[in-house]
Amino acid sequence: MNSVSPAAAQYRSGSPEDARRPEGRRPRGPRVPDPNGPRPSGASGPALGSPAAAPGEPDEVDKFKAKFLTAWNNVKYGWAVKSRTSFSKISSVHLCGRRYRFEGEGDIQRFQRDFVSRLWLTYRRDFPPLAGGCLTSDCGWGCMLRSGQMMLAQGLLLHFLPRDWTWAEGPGLGPSEPAGLASPNRYRGPARWMPPRWAQGTPELEQERRHRQIVSWFADHPQAPFGLHRLVELGQSSGKKAGDWYGPSLVAHILRKAVESCSEITRLVVYVSQDCTVYKADVARLVARPDPTAEWKSVVILVPVRLGGETLNPVYVPCVKELLRSELCLGIMGGKPRHSLYFIGYQDDFLLYLDPHYCQPTVDVSQADFPLESFHCTSPRKMAFAKMDPSCTVGFYAGDQKEFETLCSELTRVLSSSSATERYPMFTLAEGHAQDHSLDDLCSQLSQPTLRLPRTGRLLKAKRPSSEDFVFL
């Protein structure tokens, strides 16, 4: 069999199909929700028979249930880690826009280094309580937010570091159980990292400083600009709260707001497409500077799409592969139904992904030389395209005007390819502004004759589509 289980690279397989988690007794106090069941809003007041907890702090029942769900979640994840997944020696592997062939040890090592260098953001436990409640873990409900964090983190790596950057201390691939992590009792928020090595002023030192700074921005602390606390806070304006399920479209808008409000990042903006359409003039207006001679800002473009009905329509698979081959693609925030994953590549008919469902202790990033192992995954995982949830968000990054023009050319080619002629494209590129197109559509409708129907009875109220609905084939 022409495959390699690269123990040469110790690759591990992906997680099995989700099983329903057993539900125990329901205390009256706030509880960690069942990830596969309805998302509760929580309740106030302590559980019967338990001492009242201080405001904003979980009681003993909540702590026990959080620990139980964490243990159950990690049992499922750990079981999957024990099995191996094989990679073909014949077919190319595409990872974050780069192509690899496992023809020799050097090829495997380059893939190892590239994969391990991606930021891996997972469930965490024992962090400060989230606003408006007493949850100290996102286990069971925060996977889509974590997938969104990983996509934004990949954009920040491209924005601040060279495209060929890899983590110099990245370990070899193997089981993804990080070692030596502490669960701090006190939280002081993101702080500047004091370098432990390398001579002052070297490029390696500056890149490692930036790497650690990016990681600290995603810390599980209220002060972190892209941490879970901040994302949950921004989701409140859309009616979401800690413990709710977040869809890929909503998370895209939350990320846009988070970048807008971050004072530490001034040359990066986020654009979220409307109605599966990227309007070039809107992007240009967003990234342009008041001075026409000044350079454009960098932009992360997020495109929420729906690629089928209940399941993925296979006609979209070639287009998804084409997009994942682009160096300007940040990957796909999606997953399986009720199980979010971050897709960063593929081989043959299988997607490569990072899984946020492993629950780890919170890391205090205010400590000098805080451990990085839990932010980098050593276990590549694969999933068949057929299992992909059709609702997802595709991400792209353009560092300047030239890269944006290159991206538009690539997308035009991919979306208008021969494989897309007999179906709806994943999304479209359009000249001008969204406002102009809306006005043109309105004028064309007003210019047509209007047919008035007699009132023959009670009018039926049309169902209003949700923000997560899209037109699909």
Curated annotation (Swiss-Prot):
UniProt entry keywords in alphabetical sequence: Apoptosis, Autophagy, Cytoplasm, Hydrolase, Mitochondrion, Phosphoprotein, Protease, Protein transport, Thiol protease, Transport, Ubl conjugation pathway
Region of interest (Disordered), residue spans: 1-59
Sites of Phosphoserine modification: S466
Top EC category: hydrolase
Effect of A430T: Found in dogs with neurodegenerative disease
Post-translational modification: Cleaved by CASP3 during apoptosis which leads to increased activity. The cleavage by CASP3 reveals a cryptic mitochondrial targeting sequence immediately downstream of their canonical caspase cleavage sites which leads to mitochondrial import of the protein.
Highest rank taxon of the organism: Eukaryota
InterPro entries per the UniProt record, alphabetical: Papain-like_cys_pep_sf (IPR038765), Peptidase_C54 (IPR005078), Peptidase_C54_cat (IPR046792)
Site (Cleavage): D62, K63
Description of how activity is regulated: Inhibited by N-ethylmaleimide.
Active site: C143, D355, H357
GO cellular component, one term: nucleoplasm
Family: Belongs to the peptidase C54 family.
Protein name (database record): Cysteine protease ATG4D
Annotated source species: Canis lupus familiaris (Dog)
The organism's taxonomic lineage, starting at the top: Eukaryota, Metazoa, Chordata, Craniata, Vertebrata
